[in-house]
């Protein structure tokens, strides 16, 4: 039986980006210390944590030392190498579980898992050779989207294929890796549900948010999402079923396409999620606190939405809007303290209460 952590315990977090930063702040509010493990120097989370180890994920000595100095380990991104998890697991528990992580790390396993639960995904074909790509294209037709099975995020590692696409060139451009071809979903809009499950099996889901992506990167999330009552209930029940079937502990983000009024699951992330940032200003207990509560073995908090919110990301040079947003005064600003401005880099976000 997994232990219940008391305030004052230390939570280890793999990854020091903005999600690790906001997890650290939520943990600190509950009296926990955090220790960040991250390869790069001066990551956002290290400014708000009590411990920071700068090391690569294959530095097993540092990983062992890190894991033996904390009471539980969680993570802010899903592409953690298996070898690192093997080391950590010998020292302390990891939440969410390795099983959830393994499935979400591989788009093929993920789709098979979702279909097995009886839920819809885009149609798909495994692709592991140029001939395989030609065969998959004959099956699924165009438009379709070719994605790397692993290590993709924010639209990276994927390409949209049309009638004139050249399979040889495309296969080579994606690095001849293990791929998946997905039928193009002609959706009207995209939504996501942020759900959480505690160690004793309590489940709580935040209201679905409606997401707008540009170039594969999330731009805005609006709550409430444009859904019928039935669709909203279905999205929440699907999320709960995924949590239940994985015996999951922590927060999950499940992304859906809404196409012809049908909910089609795109993917899930076994962690706090960018499309859940609205909860920071729209709920008594936000996704970050909910995650810390769950992995600490505490009861989940009240995630009921008390207002309508729009969350907007500040991407790349949109961070230059900061002075205007400060002058505006009516939005809640969340800045990550990143120094280098790069195209596509998430620099901050803000939440605006609509009503
Ligand atoms: P992903 O990295 O798989 O979440 O994809 C990023 C974004 O690309 C999604 O949020 C969608 O806007 C779009 N997208 C991904 N897969 C598909 C698909 N099969 N059909 C249509 N659009 C897609």
What do these predicted ranges mean?
Residues 1-109, 131:
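ATP-binding N-terminal substructure of ATP-dependent carboxylate-amine bond-forming enzymes
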Residues 32, 50, 92-93, 119-122, ...:
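A structural micro-motif
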Residues 103-192, 196-242, 355:
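Active-site nucleotide/adenylate-binding loops and adjacent lid/helix of ATP-dependent enzymes
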Residues 173-227, 232-265, 269-277, 289-302, ...:
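Phosphate-binding core of ATP-grasp and ATP-grasp-like enzymes
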Residues 280-281:
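A conserved FAD-binding loop/helix module that cradles the flavin
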Residues 305-314:
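Short glycine-/aliphatic-rich beta-strand segments at the starts of folded cytosolic domains
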Residues 313, 318-321:
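Extracellular/lumenal mucin-like low-complexity stalks
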Residues 341-354:
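An anion-binding loop in the catalytic cleft
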């Amino acid at each position: 039986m997994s232990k219940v952590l008391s305030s004052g315990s230390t939570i280890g977090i793999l990854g020091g980006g903005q999600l690790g930063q906001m997890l650290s702040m939520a943990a600190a509010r509950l009296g926990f210390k955090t220790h960040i493990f991250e390869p790069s120097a001066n990551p956002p989370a290290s400014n708000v944590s009590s411990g920071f180890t700068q090391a690569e994920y294959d530095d097993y000595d540092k990983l062992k030392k890190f894991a033996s100095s904390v009471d539980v380990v969680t993570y802010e991104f899903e592409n953690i190498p298996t070898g690192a998890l093997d080391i950590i697991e010998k020292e302390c528990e990891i939440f969410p579980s390795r099983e959830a992580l393994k499935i979400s790390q591989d788009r093929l396993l993920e789709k098979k898992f979702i279909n097995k639960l009886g839920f819809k995904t885009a149609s798909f074909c495994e692709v592991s050779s140029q001939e395989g790509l030609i065969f998959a294209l004959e099956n699924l037709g165009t438009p379709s989207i070719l994605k790397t099975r692993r290590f993709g995020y924010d639209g990276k590692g994927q390409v949209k294929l049309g009638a004139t696409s050249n399979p040889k060139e495309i296969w080579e451009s994606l690095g001849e890796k293990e791929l998946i071809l997905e039928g193009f979903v002609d959706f009207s809009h995209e939504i996501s549900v942020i759900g959480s499950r505690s160690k004793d099996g309590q489940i709580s889901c935040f209201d679905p948010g409606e997401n707008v992506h540009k170039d594969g990167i999330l731009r805005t999330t609006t709550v409430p999402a444009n859904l019928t009552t039935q669709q909203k209930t279905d999205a929440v029940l699907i999320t709960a079923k995924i949590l239940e079937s994985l015996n999951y502990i922590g927060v999950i983000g499940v992304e859906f396409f809404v196409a012809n009024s049908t909910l089609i699951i795109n993917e899930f992330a076994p962690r706090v999620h960018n499309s859940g940032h609205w909860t920071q200003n729209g709920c008594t207990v936000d996704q970050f606190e909910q995650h810390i509560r769950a992995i600490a073995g505490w009861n989940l908090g009240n995630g009921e939405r008390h207002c309508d919110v729009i969350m907007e990301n500040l991407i790349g040079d949109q961070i230059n809007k900061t002075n205007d947003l400060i002058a505006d005064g009516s939005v809640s600003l969340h800045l990550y303290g990143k120094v280098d401005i790069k195209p596509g880099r998430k620099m901050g976000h803000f939440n605006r209460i609509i009503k």
